[in-house]
């Protein structure tokens, strides 16, 4: 078993512990096996998550005042309530999707693991390790921000415990899925590099066949399975992104903290959503599949013509490649690549402006009511 496969097994182990992909890895046959015990574990874990998220959503809906932060304005408290409920809904949806399509996910991941075994590289191995280290560091930062921020803001004990539990668990689950998706894309990129090297060496038939298999998998199962997951995850991160800056504007910059607390709260608010945004940017910037696929066409244009049937095959491939765009999408709503980053940051800035406008309207209403 290659060293890269061992690194990918870290993701599989973490996903198994969190009840998302409960399989055992057979290293001899590079096969994922679902046992009766793992199936029971998946059912029980998913059931607990569905019950817990539903209970949290209902509690927040029936008792919104319990989650109010005294130093925050009405707009901010409403926004925080929306984020909490949305997080519960997204966790609910993710576990429903993963359990309902567990057999499709198993076949997909197993196929990519076998591709990884054939096309392993030390560069990809380092990327897997770096992703895991980054995931751990951002989890610690996220935990520290939430604990310190909500404690200093004066949130009551019960809602504080609920917010910590829901948000930290959501970060662990959703960002692990983002990291795993990034790693799968890196495996497929390594596969395309491998087959492009075969093309350079003159092995056209094998190289083109392998390349088409990867792109078919990318545009088919990978797109459908993970595109559906990425849609609610990206939407949630987009919703959460303005919360830190808005809290900073509404409390710290308006002097609602003591002078000795301002600096630490300024730092906490500034980095509040940083872990989520780093994960999202990493997922969207990992775009090696499209880059390597485009390299194939450039290589084939340099192949000398021989006057045989191979020339016609290359010409057909190039014509097809002009129409084919191996871009991963969130179920067709937007592309999961670097082109989406600018649109997302524009949307975040727009949401931020809207929130600030509502805050100003609230302050104006309070001023009028005083007279």
Curated annotation (Swiss-Prot):
**Membrane-spanning residues:** 42-62, 81-101, 128-148, 162-182, 229-249, 264-284, 341-361
Its placement in the membrane is given as:
Multi-pass membrane protein
UniProt note on tissues of expression: Expressed in the adult labellar chemosensory neurons, and adult thorax and wing. In larvae, is expressed in neurons of the posterior pharyngeal sense organ.
Against InterPro entries, the record matches this protein to: 7TM_chemorcpt
The Gene Ontology biological process annotation of the record reads: chemosensory behavior; male courtship behavior; sensory perception of taste; signal transduction
Q: Which GO terms describe its cellular component?
A: axon; dendrite; membrane; neuronal cell body; plasma membrane
Indicate the principal place this protein occupies in or around the cell. Answer: membrane
Source organism, top-level taxon:
Eukaryota
Provide the phenotype resulting from gene inactivation.
Leads to reduced courtship levels toward females.
Q: Which residues are glycosylated?
A: 73, 363
Q: What keywords appear on the UniProt entry?
A: Cell membrane, Glycoprotein, Membrane, Receptor, Transducer, Transmembrane, Transmembrane helix
Which Pfam families does the record cross-reference, listed alphabetically?
Answer: 7tm_7
Location in the cell = Cell membrane
Which sequence ranges are listed under topological domain Cytoplasmic?
1-41, 102-127, 183-228, 285-340
Q: Which family does it belong to?
A: Belongs to the insect chemoreceptor superfamily. Gustatory receptor (GR) family. Gr21a subfamily.
Q: Which PANTHER family match?
A: GUSTATORY AND PHEROMONE RECEPTOR 32A-RELATED (PTHR21143:SF133), INVERTEBRATE GUSTATORY RECEPTOR (PTHR21143)
As for what it does, the entry says: Gustatory receptor which mediates acceptance or avoidance behavior, depending on its substrates. Plays a role in sustaining courtship behavior in males, possibly through the reception of a stimulating arrestant pheromone.
- Its recorded name reads Gustatory and pheromone receptor 39a, isoform A
User: From which organism does this entry originate?
Assistant: Drosophila melanogaster (Fruit fly)
């Amino acid at each position: 078993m290659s060293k890269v496969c061992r690194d990918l097994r870290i993701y599989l182990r973490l996903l198994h512990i969190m009840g998302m992909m409960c399989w055992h890895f057979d290293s001899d046959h590079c096969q994922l096996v679902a046992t009766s015990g793992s199936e029971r574990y998946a059912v029980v874990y998913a059931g607990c998550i569905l019950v817990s998220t539903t209970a949290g959503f209902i509690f927040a809906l029936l008792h919104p005042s319990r989650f109010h932060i005294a130093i925050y304005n009405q707009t901010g408290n409403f926004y925080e309530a929306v984020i909490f409920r949305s997080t519960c809904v997204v966790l609910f949806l993710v576990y429903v999707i993963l359990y309902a399509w567990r057999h499709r996910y198993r076949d997909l991941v197993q196929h990519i693991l076998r591709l990884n075994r054939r096309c392993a590289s030390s560069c990809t191995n380092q990327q897997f390790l770096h992703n895991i280290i980054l995931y751990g560091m951002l989890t610690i930062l996220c935990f520290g921000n939430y604990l310190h921020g909500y404690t200093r803001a004066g949130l009551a004990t019960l809602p504080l415990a609920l917010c910590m539990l829901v948000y930290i668990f959501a970060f662990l689950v959703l960002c692990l899925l983002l990291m795993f998706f990034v790693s799968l894309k890196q495996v497929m990129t390594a596969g395309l590099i491998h087959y492009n090297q075969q093309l350079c060496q003159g092995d056209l038939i094998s190289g083109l066949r392998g390349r088409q298999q990867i792109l078919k998998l990318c545009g088919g199962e990978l797109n459908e399975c993970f595109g559906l997951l990425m849609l609610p995850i990206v939407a949630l991160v987009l919703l959460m992104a303005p919360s830190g800056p808005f809290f900073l504007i509404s409390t710290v910059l308006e002097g609602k903290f003591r002078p000795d607390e301002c600096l630490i709260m300024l730092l906490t608010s500034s980095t509040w959503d940083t872990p989520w945004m780093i994960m999202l940017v990493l997922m969207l910037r990992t775009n090696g599949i499209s880059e390597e696929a485009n390299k194939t066409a450039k290589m084939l244009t340099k192949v000398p013509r021989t006057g045989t049937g191979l020339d016609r095959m290359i010409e057909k491939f190039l014509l097809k490649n002009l129409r084919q765009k191996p871009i991963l999408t969130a179920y067709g709503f937007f592309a999961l690549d670097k082109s989406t980053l600018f649109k997302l940051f524009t949307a975040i800035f727009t949401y931020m402006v809207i929130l600030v406008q509502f805050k100003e309207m609230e302050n104006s209403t309070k001023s009028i009511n005083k007279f």
